[in-house]
Amino acid sequence: MKNILFATSEAVPFIKTGGLADVAGSLPKYFDKRYFDIRVILPKYACMKQEWKDKMEYVTHFYMDLGYKNCYVGILQMEYDGIKFYFIDNEYYFSGPKPYDSAPWDLEKFAFFSKAVLSVLPVIDFRPDIIHCHDWQTGLVPVYLHDSFQQNQFFWGIKTIMTIHNLKFQGVYDVKTIKELTGLSDYYFTPDKLEAYKDGNFLKGGIVFADAVTTVSNTYADEIKTPFYGEGLDGLLRARSNSLRGIVNGIDYNDFNPETDINLSARYNATTFRKEKVKNKIQLQKDLGLEQDPKAMMIGIVSRLTDQKGFDLIAYIMDELCQDSVQIVALGTGDERYENMFRHFDWKYHGKVSAQIYYDESMSHRIYAASDAFLMPSLFEPCGLSQLMSLRYGTLPIVRETGGLKDTVEPYNEFEGTGTGFSFSNYNAHEMLSTIRYAERIYYDKKREWNKMVDRAMAKDFSWSNSARQYEEMYNWLIGE
């Protein structure tokens, strides 16, 4: 039996701010239980729902040094979906109204968490063969493991993997502060270790000291070795390219299933979508005050409204796009200027554009089901889960060829009759517009071709079991079997 510990700052269903929670919470249950004992460790935030906190059972507590402090470390545990979750408790660090705050407070909080992850292992009597760390919040786990923990035989031979979900977030602050917070010696603050451009960098420490580095799609693994996508760490990632690989994320096919989804007004599957899918569109048009036209092409957008997601392109061509016979439904929150942009177009083209400036899981499912196409023109996209959800619901993605979007959406080829969506390659508003208009043409003039594409999209398998097989293979390679 191989023991694997996921160290993460968030995991569904306990706490979620982004895609990292989906990976850490959903992936573990898809491993082969005969060969892998997967457990997850995360902080016990005060902002978790009370129903989860009530189910956690206290294991023990102890005190641990961190820099110049002596910190309380409480351990709680519970089982969910057959997976054991451990929670690190410390009210000083984890009592805020949300999981993340601002540097340097977050850095101290996750330096504490990284050290606590290692400190609790002998206490809970679980010795992992591999500690799988996720994003900068756990970047110091491989560093601490390499440092003082080597004095204890228990930790000898434990391997670490660093998974980068988004390279943009690295956990950076000045060296003096990080040295004080972490209690690490000067040895670690050189340009070949934790120092990057005169600052201390948590993620860099993780990448340098981990035994293997992964990211969440093949294309993104290649892209981050270039200056444009590398966020200042491209040189290091090129140096580590032998142990860097991309494994595409999946989605939970039980949660996202148009045949059983309770949020939909009409459920459907790959054989019934031609008749049933449109009923969701009619209902959504009614509920959102759009013109009720079952034949109108509806384009869905469900996203954080930020620069990364390509909303400057959408802003640029929105007036032109609204001259076409399309309807646009957007759901999400984010930068104020993009929120206001969608509010403006909702007002200007009322009946064609609907801006839902909030986030609601049930509404997102309804948009995936009701839309004909799903727009996702990201500037960069490590993996992206929305396009996988839209494929699952038979809604064809229109994407920019970057990161996970390039790996998961096969562009339509009308001569070969292949493809599961539409794509464009340059970050250019009119290139995006012409791709949308090409999709409109297929939708209105070649409906049979469109439906065949929906068939292919719904037949794709991006469930977690696919990703789990690739992770298992990597664990075996790292353990040496």
Predicted regions and their residues:
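Catalytic cores of nucleotide-sugar-dependent glycosyltransferases that transfer UDP/GDP/TDP-activated
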Residues: 1-481
